[in-house]
UniProtKB/Swiss-Prot annotation:
Listed name of the protein: Phosphoribosylaminoimidazole-succinocarboxamide synthase
The species this protein was found in: Streptococcus mutans serotype c (strain ATCC 700610 / UA159)
UniProt-listed Enzyme Commission number(s): 6.3.2.6
Source taxon at top rank: Bacteria
Residue spans crossing the bilayer: none
PROSITE patterns listed in its UniProt record: SAICAR_SYNTHETASE_1, SAICAR_SYNTHETASE_2
GO BP terms, alphabetized: 'de novo' IMP biosynthetic process; cobalamin biosynthetic process
Pathway(s) per entry: Purine metabolism; IMP biosynthesis via de novo pathway; 5-amino-1-(5-phospho-D-ribosyl)imidazole-4-carboxamide from 5-amino-1-(5-phospho-D-ribosyl)imidazole-4-carboxylate: step 1/2
Name of the coding gene: purC
């Protein structure tokens, strides 16, 4: 399998394969927070994120969600369909936390009556600014039809994920998704789903996600290992 580096990100490297429509995502042991300001190498993180994301994407595929995931090929690598990423971070919030609480001056932990979908312009130089539908169209990131589909699909994914995490005693607080266009021009779910890009709280309100690293609350891999062990209990 020919492996040439296409892109090196904070959490993953993207490599070519012999098929121009398939790439390898190689998960790193690097942890970052605050848009890369806080950075640390944490042994075992890449393997855990690859395991967790592979399992979640397998379940999403089985539930009828169109994703880029093909299969896990090693402890830290997976095969994905190549997509043209839409430079949007799509955030869904079930409970107030993090930047939402800071932005609106509300305490963390308030259950929202209806999940809120937010868009952020994926641009490191601009610190990924919070934008609305009109900005998305002005920047020509997506049209009305694309926006409606992305929002509806994000809400559908939220229902699936919230149920799965509830089954293993975890509450899905919020999460970030990325979408892209496949070779046929269809929008599909891309990137990853792991404790790196979601918030999970246990029954006691303990953080079971990257906030452990972001806020200096403990060992990241210890928490991710617990999430991985719990996920394997899913039917």
């Amino acid at each position: 399998m020919a492996k040439e580096l296409i892109y090196s990100g904070k959490a993953k490297d993207i490599l070519t394969t012999e098929d121009e429509n398939v790439i390898i995502a190689q998960y790193k042991d690097q942890a970052t927070a605050l848009n890369g300001v806080k950075k640390e190498q944490i042994a075992g993180k890449g393997q855990l994120n690859n395991q967790i994301s592979s399992l979640i994407f397998q379940k999403l595929n089985a539930a009828g969600v169109a994703t880029h995931f093909i299969k896990k090929i090693s402890e830290t690598e997976q095969l994905n369909k190549k997509v043209k990423i839409i430079p949007l971070e799509v955030v869904l919030r079930n409970v107030t936390a993090g930047s939402f609480s800071k932005r609106f001056g509300v305490k963390e932990g308030i259950q929202l009556e209806k999940p809120i979908v937010e868009f952020y312009y994926k641009n490191d130089d601009l610190d990924d600014p919070f934008i609305n539908d009109e900005h998305v169209k002005f920047l020509k990131l997506a049209n009305d039809e694309d926006i409606a589909y992305i929002k509806a699909e994000t809400r559908r994914i939220n229902k699936l994920l919230s149920d799965w995490f509830h089954q293993i005693g975890l509450k899905l607080i919020d999460f970030k998704l990325e979408f892209g266009f496949d070779k046929d021009g269809k929008i599909i779910l891309a990137d990853e789903f792991s404790p790196d890009n979601c918030r999970l709280w246990d029954a006691q309100g303990h953080h079971m996600d990257k906030d452990v690293f972001r806020r200096g609350l403990g060992e990241l891999t210890d928490v991710y290992e617990v999430v991985w062990e719990k996920l394997q209990e899913l039917k």
